[in-house]
Amino acid sequence: MERRTFMNVTAGAATAFALNPLALAQEQARKTPVLYPDPAVEIIDPRFAKYKVGNAAVERLYTGARWAEGPVWFGDGRFLLFSDIPNNRMLRWLEDTGEVSVFRSPSNYSNGNYRDRQGRLLTCEHDSRRLTRTEYDGTITVLMDRFQGKKLNAPNDLAVHSDGSIWFSDPGYGIMSNYEGHKAPFELPANVYRLDPNTAAVTVVADDMDKPNGLCFSPDEKKIYIVDSGVP
């Protein structure tokens, strides 16, 4: 290739690249980690300061979900599963390649996900109004879809105790509109339940919240923290 031809080709490629600054910015944003903790985050209670991880960064793994929810990590497979509620699907991110693919579609407008003590996937499904478990062979077992003969609202989020019991919130967001499920009448109050998967025994552990949502146990499991997203 002559020097003049080479220069023209190079200049053309550079011009084409320069004409797409949006793609460049998006790629740079995806690759550039953000220092953690973000200086824009204000700590109100000084007791929280000890939980900061100073020598860490935040990296964007995926852009393209309408509403990403319920991430759950599978360390044995080196992948992350999460729900994309309005798109009615679950996605999987692979650590080795960074590739994101569809894990389950339709997902019954899945929301929260967790792993039980045996490592199986537990999922709160809005549209089917149930709590399910994905078995090792990929089949799905319905753990609970009714309480006292009435349909659950739309299970939202969950946590698993070391005794194997499954605690989940049922605020009903998935039946309030057709955006994250399908609109339907409420048959039960917005409760938080404890399910023993071995005996199928169910207990209402909280019935005085407007919209119980995310929940987690304290490290010693003597307390459970529940977010009431219905409180202004």
Regions found by a protein language model. Give the residues of each.
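Sequence-structural signature of mature extracellular/luminal beta-sheet repeat domains
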Residues: 2-14, 24-232
